[in-house]
């Protein structure tokens, strides 16, 4: 029997400069759905450019809690999280408080 696939919290950079966070157990399939316009309503109106980050979680419930936490954060905290993941240079970091969804 195959082990269950981990769930991922992911963050997309959209064409309008905004971020979109979501969860999936198949990141490539979900990103392609966003690109085709068959993903979330938000990404239909604001098409994604790239996946900025993703983090695996053991199950959907844990990934959903992390997604909720991330979506509660202001843009500055999201940028801090991206910098902590090594996806933005240190000078782009707006504050010293890393976001650690769990």
From Swiss-Prot:
CDD domains: GIY-YIG_UPF0213. Residues 5-80 form the GIY-YIG domain. Gene3D superfamilies: GIY-YIG endonuclease (3.40.1440.10). InterPro entries: GIY-YIG_endonuc, GIY-YIG_endonuc_sf, UPF0213_domain. Belongs to the UPF0213 family. This is UPF0213 protein XCC3072.
